[in-house]
Amino acid sequence: DAHYWLGRIYYIQKKYSEAAIALAEFNTLYPDDKRLQETTLLIAESATKFAPKEQICGILTQTRDFMTNPSTKFTKRITSLINKNNCSGE
């Protein structure tokens, strides 16, 4: 749980790189946690704040394709991020 909360705190503080690292560690340690979709979305959202522009579309499409049986909320949010970042050709 510490990695989850640390990631959330970093995200709120707009420390996006640190948030992505903490949340990715959480996902690695707890791949079956019920918050996996939430943390994966936060990682993607964080990446849009710090990743080089030429990598963002790849990150977002990989995130979309990574999730098995995504919720409607997940699908809508990741699609929104893809569209917002002009990744429609991905």
Short names for language-model regions:
Residues 1, 35-38:
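Start-of-helix register in tetratricopeptide repeats
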Residues 28-36, 65-77, 87-88:
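Short solvent-exposed coil/turn linkers within tandem alpha-helical repeat scaffolds
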